[in-house]
Amino acid sequence: ILLISVFSLIGKGEICSNKFGSTKEIEEEFNKTWNRLVPKGIPFKSMYTTPFWHLASEPFWNVYTSDGSSVDDIWHKPIMSIKRQRKELSAIIDFNLYNIILDNEIRSAIIAHLESIVRKGLNL
């Protein structure tokens, strides 16, 4: 859901680089997407901070501190407050992926595919 949210914000021009901070806009888009895709009663909580960290294990997503340092396992705390995360963290997605996502047709197809994966994962 976080990828869908980030890709949507890229499409809206609200994320204009492959490097971006953990922002209120991303959180709001995540919550909007969550509410649209995840039915009420599902035992998961809408917290964009969790996938922000989990995506760090993917080769196309890197998490950095505000001073540009890579986040290591000791500092890696997925439960950090949203306020602290907004202040201290940035993500960088692969430059080639970012350029692909700029294409409206490709972005729409990828978002549709990711949404179908979410629905399948929730058995909808």
Give the residues covered by each predicted segment:
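Intrinsically disordered, charged low-complexity linkers and terminal tails
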Residues: 1-124
